[in-house]
C-alpha cells in the first residue's frame, strides 16, 4: 500500500441548531415595536402638517377675499395705500409659498422614510422566509436520513436472511455427518426442543422488527404529511407576500397628481401613505404570526424527528444485540445423532418454510421500498418545481423594476412642467406683443391728435389776435365816435342852430361804421363758432381714443383670459402627445423585457429539463442499483439453494451406493447360502424388498432434486440475461437521452446568445434614446434660461412702457384740463364782450333816440340857451351818458385785465409743460435706475446661488478626489490581494496536479499488480479513483475561482472607469459654473456703469432745472389743487354770467317800460313811425343778443357736462391704472413662482438624472451578474458531462465485476462474507455521519476541541467573504480578516495534514451504491468540500451550543437581563446578522 499525505473527504453532514422561536419572536417583536413608534411619530407629524395646510388654505382664502374686496373698492382708494397693501400681501403670499415649500420638503422626507420602512420590512420578510426555508430543508434532511435508516433496516433483514440460510445449510450438513457417537434419546429431544425454541425466538424477533418497520413507515408518512403542510404554508405565505406586493404596486400606480392641485395632491399623498403604512403593518403582523406559527411547527417537527431518530437508534441497538445473541447461539455448534433423521428432516422443513415466508416478506418489503422510492422521487420533483416557481416569481418581481417606473414618472412630471412653462412663456409673449401693438397704435393716434391740437391752437391764437385787433379798432372807432359826440355836443352848445344835414351826414357815417363793425363781429363770431366746433370735435376724438384705449385694455384682459383657457386644451394636447411617446417607449421596453423574460424562461426550461434529466438519471441509477442488488440477492439465494441441493444429493448418492453394495452382498449371500432356513430367506427377501423400495425412493428423490437444480440454473441464467439486457437498455436510453439533452442545450444556448445580442442592441438603442432625451432636456433648460432672461427684459420694457403710458395719460389729462379751463375763460371773456357790445348797442340806440328827440325839439322850438341848459330831461340824459361812459371805461379796463390774465395763464401753462417734460425725463431715469437695480439684485442673487453651487461643487470635488484616492488605494490593495490569492491558488493547483500524477501512477501500479482484482484490491482501486476524481474536481474549482477573481478584477476596473467618468463630468460642470459666474460678473459691471450714467444724468437735470425741482415731489397734488381752483373759478364765472343774465333781463324789462312811455308820450308827433321803426330794430337786436346769450348758456351747460364726463373718465382711467398695477403685481408674482418652479424643476431633473445613472449602474451590475450566472450554469453543464463520464466508467466497472462474480463457490462465499462485513461497517459509518444524535455531535466535538478558536476565526472570515462579495470596501475588510487569520489558517493546515488517515476498504456492492448515490451530494457540496480539504475554510456551521461556548463575554454588562443576554448572543451570531440589521434599522 502507498502511504500518501492527502486530505480525506469528510462526507458528514452537520445539522444546524437554530435558536428557539421564542427568542426570534422576541427580537422581531422589539423590531416592530420600534417601527410602530416610528409610525406613530410619522402620523403625528402628518397631522401637524395637515393642520398647517388647513391654516395655510384658510389664510389663502382670506387673502383672496380681501383681494376681491380691494379690487371692488380699489377705485375709491389712493394708489399709494393700495400699492403698500399689495406689497404686504405679496410678502404674505411669498411667506405662504415658502411655508408650502417647507411642507413639500417635509412630505418628501416622510415619503423617503416610508420607503425606507418598506425596504426594511421586505428585508425582514425575506430573512424570515429564509429561516422558514432552512427549517423546511432541515425537515427534508431528517426525512432523507429516515429513508436511509429504513434502507439500512432492509439491508439488515437481508443480512439476517443470509444468516438464516447459513444456519439452514450448517444444520443440513451437520445432520448425517455428525460424530459416530450416539446420544441418548433424552439428549436428542432436548436438543430438538432447544433448536425449535431458538427458531421460534428468531421468528418472534423478526416479527417484532417487521412491526417496528411498519411503525417507521407510518412515521415516515406522518413526516411526509408534515412536509406537505409546511409546503402549503410556505405557498400560502408566498401568495400573501405576492398580494402585499401587488397591493403595494397598485398603491404606487395610484399616486398621480392631476391638474397641478398641490394641496389636494399633498393631502391625498399623506392619507394614502398613512393608509398604506397601516395596511403594510397589519400585513406585517399577520405574516409575523404566520411565520411564528410555521417556526413553531418546524420546531415541533424537528423535535419529532429527533425523537424518531432516538427511537430508531434504540431499535437498531436492540436488533444488533439480538443478532449478536443469536449468532453466539448459532456459532456454539449444536450436535445431534444419526438416528433421529426424521426429526432432523422435520426441523429442516420447518426452517425451509420459515425461510420461504421470510423471502416472500422480503420481496414485499423490497416492492414497498421501491414504491416509497418512487413517492420520494415524485416529492423531490414537486419540491424542485416549487423552488423553480419561487425563483421564477422572484425573478419576475425583480424584473419589474420600480426605478424605471419612477424615472418615467419623473420624466413625465418634468416634461409637463416644461410644457406648462413654455405655455406661460408663450402667453406672456403674446400679451406683451399685443400690448406693444396697442401702444404703437395709441402713440400714432396721440401724435396725430397732438398735431391737430397744435394746428387748432394756432388757429385759436390767430383768431384771438384778430379779436384783439377788432377790439382795438372798435375802441378806436368808439373813441372817435365819442370825440365826435363831444364835438357835436360842444357845437350844439356853442351853435344854437346847427345844420340838420351835417348831423344827418354824421349820423349816416356813424351808422355805416356801426354796420361795418357789426359785420366784422358777425364774421368773427362765425369763425369762433367753427373753432369751437373743431375743439368739440377734438374733445370727442380724445374721448373716443380713451374709449378705444379702455376697449384695448379690456380686449387684452379678455385675450389673456381666453389664452389661459386655451392653454389648458393645449396642455392636454401636449400631455396626450407626450403620453403617447412614453407609451411607445413603454411598449418598446415591455417588448424587450418580454424577450428577456422569454429567454430567461427558455433558460429556466432548459435548466428544468436538465434537472428533470438529472432526477431521471438518479432514479434510473437508483433503480439499476436496486435491481442489481435484487438480482445479486436472487443469485446468492439460488446459489445457496443449489449448494443445499448438492449437499443433500451427495449423502443420498453415498447412501444409494452403500445400499447397492449391501444389496449385492445380500444377493451374494443368498446365492451362496441355499441351506438356510425359511426364516432367514423370508427375512432376507423382506430386507431386499425394503432396500429396493428405499433405493427407488432415493433415485426418484435424486431425479427430482436434479430437475429442481436444472430449473434453478435456468432461472439463474434468465436472471443474468435479464440483468444484462436491462443494463444495456438503460445504457442505450441514457445515451439517447443525453444526446437529445445535449442537442437541446446547444439549441437553447444559441437562442439565448441570439436573444442576449438582440437585448444588448435594444439596450444600447434605449441608452442612446435616453441620452438624446437628456440632451433635449439640457437644450430645453438652456432655452428656458434664455427665455427667462428675455422675459425679464420684456417685463422691464413692459414696466417702462406702463410708466410712459401713465405719464402720457397724465399729460393728456392735464392738457384736457388746461384746454377746458382755457375754453371756459375764452367763453367767459366772449360773454363779457358780447355783453359789452349789447350794452354799446343799447347805448347807441338810446343815443340815437335822444338825438332824434333833440333834433325834434330843436326843429319844434328854439328855446334860449339858459332854457336849453336847464332842461331836466337834458340833464338826465347827460347823466345817463356819463354813467354809460363810466361803464364803457370799466368794461375796457376789465377786458384789459382779462387779456393780461390770459397771457399770464399762457406763461403758466408753458412753465407747467416744461415742468412736465422734466418730470417725465426724471421719472424715466428713475424707472431705469429701479429696473437696473432689480436686474443687479437678480444677477447678484444668481451670482450668490452660483457661488454657493460652486462651493458645493468644490466640496464634492474634494470629496470625490478623496474618495478616488481612497478608492485607488483600495483598488491597489484589492489587486494585491487578488494577486496573492491567484498565486496561492496557482500553488494549490500545482500541488493538485502533482497529486493527480501520483494518484494516476498509483492507480496504474495497483491495476498492473492486481490483475486478478478481488476483495480489498478492488476497494483500494475504487478509493484511489474516487480520490483522483475529487482532486481533479478541486483543481477545476480552483481554476474557476481564479476566473471569478479575474472577473471581480474586471468589475472593479469598470467601476474605476465609471468613477473617472463622473470626475470628468464634475470638472466640466465646474468649468461651466465658473464661466457662468464670469458672465454674471460682467453683466453686473455693465449694469453698475449704466446706473452711474443715469445718476449723473439726473444730477445734470437737477442742476439745469434749478429751483423748479423743489416743486417736483409735490407736483401731483399741486396740479390737482390748481385744477380744482380753475374749476371753482369757472363755476364762479358761470354764476356771474347767470347773475349778469338776470340783470340784463331786468334791463330788458326797463327798456320795455321806457318804450311804452315813449310811445305814449310821442304819439302826437309826426315822426312816430320812424321812432317806432327804430325801436323795433332795437328790439330785434335785443332779441338777437338774447338768443346769443341763451346759446352761450347752453354751451356753458354742455361744457360743464363735458367736464363732468371728463372727470368720470379720469376716475375710470385711474381705476383702470390701479387694475393694471394689480395685474402687473400678479404678473410679477407669477414670474417669481415660475422662477421657483423652474428651480424646483431643475432640481427634479438633477434628481432624475442621478436616479437614471443609478439605474444604469444597477442595470450593468445585474447584467454582469447574469453573465456570471451563465458561466456558472455552463460550468454545471461541464460537471454534468463529467458525472456522465464517471457513470460510464462505473457501468464498465460494474460489468467487469459481474464477470468476475461467476467464480467458484468458495470465492462466492468469501465474497458474500466480505459484503456482509462491509455492509455492517458502512451502515455504521453512514448512520453515524447522517444522524443528528448526541453521540455523533459529541464525537465530532471531541475531534474538533483543539481548533475551536481557529474555527471561530475562520467562520468569521467565511461569513464576511460570503456577505461582502462585490464591493471594494468589503473586499478590503476581507483582506484585513485574511491577514489577521493567516496564522490560524496555517495552523489548521498543519493540523489537517497531520490528521490524514486511510479509510477502511469499502465492499464492492456498497461502493457501487455509494458512487451512484453520492454524486449529487458531491456536486452540491463540492465548493465547500474543496475549501475544507484545502484548509482555507473550516466547517463554519456550528450548533448554537458550540457558538455559545465561543461567545465573547466582554459584550455583556452587569445590568443585562436574561432576555438581553439571549438577544446579544443571537445577534452576535453571523447566521442571524439580518436580525441585527432590522433591529437597528
Swiss-Prot record:
Alphabetized UniProt keyword annotations: Repeat, Virion
Source organism superkingdom: Viruses
Localisation per UniProt entry: Virion
Species this protein is from: Trichoplusia ni ascovirus 2c (TnAV-2c)
UniProt GO cellular component terms: virion component
Chain residue ranges for the region called Disordered: 65-88, 1319-1403
Ranges annotated as biased composition (Low complexity): 73-84, 1323-1336, 1393-1403
Protein name according to UniProt: Structural protein ORF147
Amino acid at each position: 500500500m502507498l502511504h500518501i499525505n492527502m486530505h480525506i473527504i469528510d462526507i458528514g453532514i452537520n445539522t444546524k441548531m437554530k435558536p428557539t422561536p421564542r427568542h426570534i419572536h422576541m427580537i422581531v417583536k422589539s423590531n416592530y415595536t420600534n417601527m410602530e413608534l416610528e409610525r406613530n411619530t410619522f402620523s403625528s407629524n402628518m397631522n401637524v402638517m395637515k393642520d398647517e395646510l388647513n391654516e395655510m388654505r384658510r389664510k389663502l382664502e382670506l387673502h383672496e377675499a380681501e383681494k376681491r374686496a380691494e379690487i371692488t373698492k380699489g377705485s375709491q382708494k389712493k394708489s399709494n395705500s393700495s400699492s403698500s397693501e399689495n406689497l404686504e400681501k405679496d410678502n404674505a403670499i411669498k411667506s405662504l409659498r415658502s411655508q408650502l415649500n417647507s411642507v413639500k420638503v417635509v412630505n418628501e422626507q416622510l415619503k423617503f422614510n416610508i420607503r425606507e420602512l418598506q425596504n426594511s420590512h421586505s428585508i425582514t420578510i425575506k430573512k424570515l422566509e429564509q429561516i422558514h426555508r432552512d427549517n423546511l430543508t432541515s425537515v427534508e434532511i431528517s426525512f432523507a436520513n429516515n429513508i436511509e435508516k429504513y434502507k439500512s433496516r432492509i439491508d439488515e433483514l437481508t443480512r439476517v436472511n443470509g444468516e438464516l440460510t447459513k444456519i439452514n445449510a450448517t444444520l443440513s450438513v451437520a445432520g448425517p455427518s455428525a460424530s459416530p457417537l450416539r446420544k441418548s434419546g433424552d439428549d436428542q429431544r432436548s436438543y430438538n426442543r432447544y433448536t425449535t425454541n431458538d427458531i421460534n425466538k428468531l421468528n418472534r424477533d423478526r416479527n417484532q422488527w417487521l412491526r417496528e418497520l411498519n411503525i417507521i413507515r407510518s412515521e415516515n408518512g406522518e413526516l411526509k404529511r408534515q412536509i406537505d403542510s409546511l409546503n402549503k404554508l410556505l405557498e400560502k405565505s408566498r401568495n400573501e407576500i405576492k398580494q402585499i406586493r401587488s397591493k403595494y404596486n397598485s398603491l404606487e400606480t395610484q399616486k398621480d397628481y392631476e391638474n397641478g392641485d398641490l394641496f389636494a395632491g399633498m393631502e391625498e399623498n399623506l392619507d394614502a401613505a398613512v393608509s398604506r403604512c397601516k395596511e403594510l403593518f397589519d400585513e406585517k403582523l399577520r405574516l409575523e404570526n404566520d411565520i411564528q406559527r410555521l417556526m413553531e411547527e418546524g420546531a415541533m417537527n424537528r423535535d419529532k424527528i429527533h425523537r424518531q431518530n432516538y427511537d430508531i437508534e434504540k431499535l437498531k441497538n436492540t436488533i444488533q444485540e439480538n443478532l449478536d445473541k443469536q449468532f453466539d447461539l448459532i456459532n456454539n455448534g449444536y450436535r445431534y445423532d444419526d438416528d433421529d433423521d426424521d426429526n432432523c428432516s422435520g426441523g429442516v422443513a420447518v426452517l425451509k418454510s420459515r425461510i420461504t415466508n421470510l423471502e416472500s416478506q422480503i420481496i414485499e418489503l423490497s416492492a414497498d421500498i421501491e414504491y416509497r422510492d418512487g413517492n420520494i422521487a415524485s416529492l423531490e420533483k414537486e419540491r424542485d418545481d416549487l423552488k423553480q416557481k419561487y425563483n421564477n416569481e422572484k425573478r419576475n418581481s425583480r424584473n419589474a423594476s420600480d426605478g424605471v417606473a419612477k424615472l418615467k414618472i419623473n420624466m413625465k412630471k418634468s416634461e409637463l412642467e416644461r410644457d406648462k412653462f413654455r405655455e406661460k412663456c408663450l402667453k406672456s409673449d403674446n400679451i406683451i406683443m399685443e400690448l406693444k401693438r396697442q401702444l404703437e397704435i395709441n402713440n400714432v393716434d396721440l401724435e396725430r391728435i397732438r398735431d391737430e391740437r397744435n394746428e387748432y391752437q394756432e388757429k385759436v391764437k390767430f383768431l384771438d389776435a384778430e379779436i384783439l385787433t377788432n377790439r382795438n379798432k372798435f375802441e378806436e372807432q368808439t373813441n372817435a365816435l365819442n370825440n365826435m359826440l363831444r364835438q357835436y355836443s360842444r357845437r350844439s352848445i356853442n351853435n344854437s342852430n346847427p345844420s340838420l344835414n351835417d348831423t344827418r351826414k354824421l349820423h349816416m357815417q356813424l351808422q355805416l361804421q356801426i354796420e361795418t363793425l357789426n359785420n366784422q363781429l358777425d364774421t368773427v363770431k362765425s369763425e369762433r363758432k367753427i373753432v369751437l366746433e373743431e375743439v368739440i370735435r377734438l374733445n370727442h376724438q380724445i374721448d373716443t381714443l380713451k374709449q378705444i384705449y379702455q376697449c384695448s385694455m379690456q380686449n387684452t384682459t379678455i385675450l389673456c383670459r381666453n389664452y389661459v383657457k386655451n392653454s389648458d386644451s393645449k396642455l392636454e394636447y401636449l400631455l396626450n402627445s407626450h403620453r403617447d411617446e412614453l407609451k411607445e417607449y413603454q411598449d418598446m421596453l415591455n417588448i424587450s423585457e418580454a424577450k428577456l423574460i422569454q429567454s430567461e424562461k427558455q433558460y429556466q426550461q432548459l435548466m428544468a429539463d436538465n434537472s428533470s434529466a438529472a432526477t431521471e438519471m438518479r432514479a434510473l441509477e437508483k433503480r439499476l442499483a436496486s435491481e442489481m442488488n435484487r438480482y445479486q440477492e436472487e443469485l446468492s439465494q439460488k446459489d445457496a439453494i443449489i449448494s443445499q441441493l448438492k449437499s443433500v444429493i451427495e449423502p443420498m448418492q453415498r447412501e444409494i451406493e452403500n445400499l447397492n453394495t449391501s444389496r449385492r452382498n445380500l444377493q451374494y449371500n443368498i446365492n451362496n447360502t441355499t441351506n438356510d432356513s425359511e426364516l432367514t430367506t423370508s427375512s432376507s427377501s423382506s430386507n431386499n424388498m425394503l432396500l429396493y423400495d428405499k433405493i427407488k425412493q432415493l433415485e426418484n428423490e435424486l431425479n427430482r432434486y436434479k430437475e429442481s437444480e436444472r430449473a434453478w440454473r435456468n432461472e439463474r441464467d434468465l436472471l443474468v440475461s435479464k440483468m444484462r439486457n436491462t443494463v444495456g437498455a438503460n445504457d442505450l436510453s441514457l445515451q439517447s437521452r443525453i444526446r437529445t439533452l445535449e442537442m437541446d442545450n446547444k439549441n437553447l444556448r444559441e437562442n439565448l446568445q441570439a436573444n442576449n445580442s438582440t437585448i444588448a442592441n435594444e439596450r444600447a438603442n434605449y441608452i442612446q434614446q435616453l441620452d438624446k432625451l437628456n440632451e433635449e432636456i439640457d437644450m430645453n433648460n438652456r432655452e428656458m434660461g434664455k427665455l427667462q432672461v428675455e422675459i425679464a427684459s420684456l417685463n422691464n420694457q413692459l414696466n417702462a412702457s406702463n410708466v410712459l403710458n401713465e405719464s402720457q395719460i397724465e399729460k393728456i389729462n392735464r392738457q384736457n384740463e388746461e384746454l377746458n379751463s382755457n375754453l371756459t375763460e375764452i367763453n367767459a371773456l366772449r360773454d363779457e364782450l358780447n355783453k359789452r357790445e349789447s350794452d354799446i348797442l343799447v347805448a347807441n340806440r338810446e343815443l340815437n333816440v335822444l338825438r332824434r328827440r333833440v333834433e325834434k325839439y330843436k326843429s319844434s322850438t328854439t328855446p334860449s340857451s339858459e332854457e336849453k341848459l336847464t332842461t331836466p330831461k337834458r340833464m338826465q340824459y347827460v347823466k345817463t351818458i356819463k354813467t354809460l361812459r363810466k361803464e364803457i371805461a370799466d368794461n375796457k379796463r376789465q377786458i384789459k385785465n382779462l387779456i393780461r390774465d390770459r397771457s399770464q395763464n399762457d406763461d403758466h401753462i408753458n412753465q407747467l409743460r416744461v415742468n412736465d417734460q422734466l418730470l417725465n425725463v426724471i421719472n424715466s431715469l428713475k424707472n431705469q435706475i429701479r429696473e437696473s437695480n432689480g436686474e443687479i439684485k437678480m444677477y447678484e442673487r444668481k451670482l450668490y446661488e452660483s457661488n454657493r453651487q460652486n462651493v458645493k461643487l468644490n466640496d464634492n470635488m474634494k470629496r470625490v478626489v478623496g474618495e478616488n484616492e481612497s478608492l485607488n488605494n483600495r483598488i491597489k490593495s484589492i489587486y494585491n490581494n487578488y494577486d496573492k490569492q491567484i498565486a496561492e491558488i496557482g500553488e494549490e493547483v500545482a500541488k493538485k496536479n502533482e497529486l493527480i500524477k501520483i494518484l494516476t501512477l498509483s492507480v496504474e501500479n495497483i491495476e498492473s499488480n492486481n490483475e486478478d482484482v478481488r476483495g480489498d484490491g478492488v476497494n483500494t482501486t475504487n478509493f484511489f479513483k474516487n480520490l483522483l476524481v475529487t482532486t481533479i474536481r478541486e483543481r477545476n474549482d480552483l481554476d474557476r475561482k481564479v476566473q471569478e477573481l479575474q472577473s471581480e478584477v474586471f468589475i472593479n476596473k469598470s467601476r474605476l472607469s465609471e468613477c473617472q467618468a463622473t470626475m470628468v463630468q464634475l470638472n466640466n460642470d465646474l468649468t461651466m459654473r465658473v464661466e457662468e459666474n464670469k458672465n454674471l460678473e460682467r453683466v453686473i459691471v455693465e449694469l453698475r456703469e449704466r446706473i452711474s450714467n443715469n445718476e449723473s444724468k439726473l444730477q445734470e437735470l437737477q442742476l439745469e432745472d434749478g429751483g423748479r425741482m423743489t416743486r417736483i415731489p409735490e407736483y401731483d397734488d399741486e396740479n390737482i389743487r390748481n385744477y380744482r381752483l380753475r374749476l371753482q373759478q369757472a363755476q364762479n364765472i358761470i354764476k356771474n354770467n347767470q347773475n349778469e343774465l338776470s340783470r340784463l333781463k331786468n334791463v330788458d324789462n326797463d327798456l320795455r317800460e321806457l318804450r311804452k312811455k315813449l310811445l305814449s308820450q310821442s304819439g302826437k308827433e309826426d315822426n312816430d313811425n320812424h321812432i317806432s321803426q327804430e325801436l323795433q330794430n332795437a328790439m330785434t337786436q335785443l332779441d338777437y343778443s338774447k338768443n346769443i346769450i341763451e346759446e352761450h348758456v347752453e354751451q356753458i351747460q354742455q361744457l360743464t357736462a363735458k367736464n363732468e364726463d371728463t372727470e368720470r373718465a379720469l376716475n375710470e382711467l385711474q381705476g383702470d391704472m390701479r387694475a393694471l398695477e394689480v395685474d402687473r403685481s400678479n404678473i410679477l408674482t407669477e414670474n417669481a413662482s415660475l422662477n421657483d418652479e423652474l428651480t424646483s424643476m431643475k432640481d427634479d431633473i438633477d434628481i432624475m438624472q442621478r436616479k437614471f445613472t443609478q439605474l444604469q449602474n444597477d442595470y450593468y451590475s445585474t447584467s454582469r451578474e447574469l453573465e456570471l450566472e451563465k458561466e456558472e450554469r455552463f460550468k454545471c453543464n461541464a460537471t454534468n458531462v463529467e458525472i456522465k463520464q464517471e457513470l460510464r466508467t462505473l457501468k464498465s466497472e460494474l460489468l467487469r465485476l459481474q464477470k468476475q462474480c461467476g467464480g467458484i463457490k468458495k470465492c462466492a462465499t468469501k465474497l458474500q462474507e466480505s459484503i456482509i462485513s462491509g455492509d455492517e461497517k458502512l451502515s455504521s459509518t453512514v448512520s453515524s455521519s447522517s444522524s443528528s444524535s448526541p453521540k455523533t455531535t459529541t464525537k465530532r466535538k471531541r475531534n474538533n476541541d483543539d481548533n475551536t478558536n481557529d474555527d471561530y476565526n475562520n467562520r468569521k472570515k467565511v461569513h464576511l467573504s460570503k456577505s461582502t462579495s462585490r464591493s471594494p470596501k468589503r473586499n478590503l475588510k476581507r483582506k484585513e480578516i485574511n491577514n489577521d487569520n493567516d496564522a490560524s489558517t496555517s495552523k489548521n493546515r498543519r493540523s489537517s495534514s497531520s490528521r490524514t488517515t486511510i479509510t477502511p476498504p469499502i465492499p464492492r456492492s456498497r461502493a457501487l451504491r455509494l458512487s451512484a448515490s453520492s454524486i449529487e451530494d458531491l456536486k452540491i457540496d463540492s465548493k465547500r468540500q474543496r475549501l475544507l480539504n484545502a484548509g482555507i475554510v473550516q466547517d463554519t456551521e456550528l450548533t448554537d451550543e458550540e457558538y455559545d461556548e465561543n461567545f465573547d463575554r466582554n459584550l455583556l454588562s452587569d445590568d443585562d437581563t436574561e432576555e438581553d443576554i439571549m438577544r446579544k448572543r443571537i445577534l452576535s451570531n453571523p447566521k442571524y446578522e439580518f436580525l441585527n440589521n432590522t433591529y437597528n434599522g
